[in-house]
UniProtKB/Swiss-Prot annotation:
Organism domain of life: Bacteria
Cited Pfam families: RmuC
InterPro entries reported in the protein's UniProt record: DNA_recombination_RmuC
Coiled coil: 25-85
Family: Belongs to the RmuC family.
Keyword Coiled coil carried by entry: yes
This protein's UniProt keywords: Coiled coil, DNA recombination
Role played: Involved in DNA recombination.
Listed name of the protein: DNA recombination protein RmuC homolog
Gene source species: Rickettsia prowazekii (strain Madrid E)
Amino acid sequence: MPSLLLLTTTILLILCVLIIWFYIKTHTLKRQLQFLSEQNLEINNNNRLLNQEKIAYLQKIEQLKCKVEYQEQMIKDSEKIREESFTSAKAALFDLGKDLSKQLIEIHKIENNTARELAEQNITTASRKFNSELERLITMVGALNKDIEQSKSTVDLIKQSLLSPIGAGLLSEITLENILKSSGLRPNLDFIMQYGLTTSDSVKLRPDAIIFLPSGNLMVIDSKASKFLVDSQDNSVNLSKTMNYHLKSLANKDYAENILTTLNKKAHNFNNVITLMFLPTEQAVEKVIAANPEFLQKAWGCNIFPVGPAGLMNMLSFAKFQITDNRRSENYKVIISEVRKLLSSIGTIADYSKKIGYNLQNMVTNYDKFAASFNRNLMSRVKTIQKLGIDSGDKAMPATLERYQIVSSKSEIIEVDAENPTQIEE
């Protein structure tokens, strides 16, 4: 009996398990069937949409096919029309070209006739102008020959003038004056032309130029010339005699001593004198040295220095440098003096400004005391009177007077060291 009950229980359990498994399996299959049905429905919908799109695309293809056939027909028609128009245009151009050729031939004939007539007129006019210009040129050549003859006579006259001692000397003086003016030196300040002086023996001397150099130095220039310097012929002997005579006369004049004596009498202080013998050209210097190789040694022995324009310009450049440097030094001293005066003026202004500051401080302090007394004594009574019913009319009364105070503080002086301090030596 118990075994039968156990068997029955086991069978029931198995049946229950099978029923539960069958139920679960059935439920699962239902779900899968429902899911597949939904997918099938969705696929059918998609197929329906795709069929609709297919029909729409087929319609578009048919429409495009019709359009293509229509355009092909239009192209064929346009090509046919173009060929016909090209044929007609070709015929029209042929006729037009024929007419235009006839017109151009006629115009060319007319232009040839006109150009020939115009060319004949231009040739006639040009021939007339050429003849008139030729006549004018012949006249000008004749006048030019006369001018050349006059110029030749003028050149001969100038040459004769230069060959004379007076003319040669004048040329040398003019050259010297032009060099001095172009050197940058100031006339009547740095140099004097044709300075006349009288020696103690009542002998009058007139050097061509005197240049005032710094440190009590003088440069005396006396221009010398000879007709043999401009003469094209070889006159070495005469040139040597003439220049030796000039050197001797210049040394006998003793410019140095007489100029120092004369200028020192006029409250000037000069110590040294440099005497230059100026020759008008460098060729003149070469001629003098070629005529007398010992001329320079003789001149240097007499403390006289012969120079041409180039040598004189070099010495004037050095002189200008010395004069400019000396003028800069003098201006430097003047600047130092003016700076001292400026510093003194700044000190005076500082004293006055300090006094003004004190006065301003006193004024503000007194005003502040007045405003305090006014607000405390007078304005309190005014407010009491206004409370009693007496007003000021149209004029508004101030509540109080503003008070001011001055705060005095010492300024901080910021000292900055210069990168390259310059020491001024007095």
